[in-house]
Amino acid sequence: GRPALSEPNPAPRVLSVSPADQIEDVLIGIEDPIVVTFESSVKPFFIDFALDPPAEVIYENNPEKTEFRLLPKTPLRDGTAYALTVAYRSEGQADATPIQIHQSSFQTLAAAPDAWNADLDVRLAEARKFTRPLIGQGKYIDINLKSQVMTIFEDGHLVDAFIVSSGLPGMDTPQGEFAIQNRAERVWSKRYSLYMPYWMAITPDGKYGIHELPEWPGGYKEGANHLGRPVSHGCVRLGVGAAARVYGWADIGTRVIVH
């Protein structure tokens, strides 16, 4: 026969949580929220989610109430261990003490260093770890003048990072939001009498762009030892290999943010 109406629902069970327990270098954002998945629908229950240190969270759930995506209302503190607890109360028992059914922890990503490392390999590794995407959709090129690092992103995810050389003080690379206007595998600069391989203009007048280390007609190429410090006349230089990689990846209209 049918079960008695008073028969209680089995307690909800957490199937999975992202970020997983004990994960480090976590960056919670709208594209990477906290996700709690239950074994079955939790419609018959009140579910409580809590972070410690305390942080107010907003959430949305799927129609079946088996998956909840949580976002803190304000960004979580950098380099901090957070505990996530999930608890429930039965319907009609809103005043009851919540029963805890899950606890896990994660560590947020540390703040970016104030001073960038002189070792360019270390600096690149730091940039890959600490550069936050400023645009969440499509392709975009991030150029950090302070670190002399270019980071390329697609749909909010890091694709690669490269050491660059931007404009000398007084001949600074302009800051702001731009887009790739035109491109050519090899461009001749009448002004400086040299070739600029893998040219990608970022300003409509074509005065500023991204290109490989320049070379003279006789074949002499600017050395890679200048990468990592601002030595150009305003353009953004990439090393051999890196320039071809960015050129092959980017499109006309790809956005560029210089900061």
Regions found by a protein language model. Give the residues of each.
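A structural motif detector for short, solvent-exposed N-terminal "entry" segments of globular domains
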Residues: 126-169
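Hydrophobic residues in beta-strands and at strand termini
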Residues: 38, 72, 108, 164-166, ...
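Soluble periplasmic/extracytoplasmic beta-strand elements of cell-envelope proteins
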Residues: 35-37, 83, 140-142, 151, ...
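Solvent-exposed, polar/charged alpha-helical surfaces in well-ordered, non-transmembrane soluble domains
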Residues: 32, 36, 83-84, 148, ...
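A mature extracytoplasmic/lumenal domain signature
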Residues: 40-42, 72-76, 82, 86-88, ...
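Exported/periplasmic cell-wall-interacting domains
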Residues: 64-66, 134-136, 171-177, 184-259
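Short beta-strand/loop motifs in extracellular/secreted proteins, especially
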Residues: 43-47, 148, 254
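Acidic, low-complexity Ser/Thr/Gly/Pro-rich repeat segments typical of extracellular/periplasmic
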Residues: 1-125, 130
